[in-house]
Amino acid sequence: ISGITAMDLRRQVSRRMSKKKAKGYKKRADRKYLLGRTYKDYKIYIGKNPNVFVTQMDTVYNDETNGPFIQTFKFINSGLIFAILHNSKTAESMKQGIDLLESILGAQVFRKYVHILLTDRGSEFSAADAMETGTDNTRRTRVFYCDPMQSGQKGSLENKHIELRYILPKGTNLRALGLIDQNALNIVLSHVNSAPVEKLGGKSPLDVTDFMYHDLFEKLEAFGLHKIEKDKVVLKPYLLKK
């Protein structure tokens, strides 16, 4: 272009973007953690390893700023939902939740029933390598991610959240309801997992886990999950007020 020198072009290229203008551009998220872990990769892995146990993972919360945050896990084969209470929703806290689950179950039982973790692409689950690595620095699980905006790909867990919400409704102050610690969450889990499920032949997830996966049941029972008699199961917000 006439009148523009090479020096002018160099100045233009090297000139920094103003802070005001830079704010208009969203930093591109690092998606390297998805490599080999997409839903397509998950389907391929399941196709080659049809007998491995799958656990679906997510977070449930009402107040994104103040929490509390519930890290949920559903053991697909037994239909049982487990959960860990957090005060923050970060990649580090979710990794610590998996560390705790491994500690509760023990390495052998964990690696058996949490062979695969299927979750969504929320930023709190982006530390794939850390989540996959056990406290002994060896692989403890394989993490895979649903496609964007496809929560139905882990619909089994999403459906269980509906039952969780009977006790912990959206829009409520969860701490005011009584969800103040893990013991309170264990009470919620005990009731949800003691409710009979049609797909399980009228048995509860805890019944099925006890009968078919007793090693898993023993670990969860020792942590604080207990069977509730069917006529005493409460799936209402007043449960923790009792």
Report each predicted region and the residues it spans.
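Secondary-structure boundary/capping micro-motif
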Residues: 1-176, 180-190, 195-197, 205-242
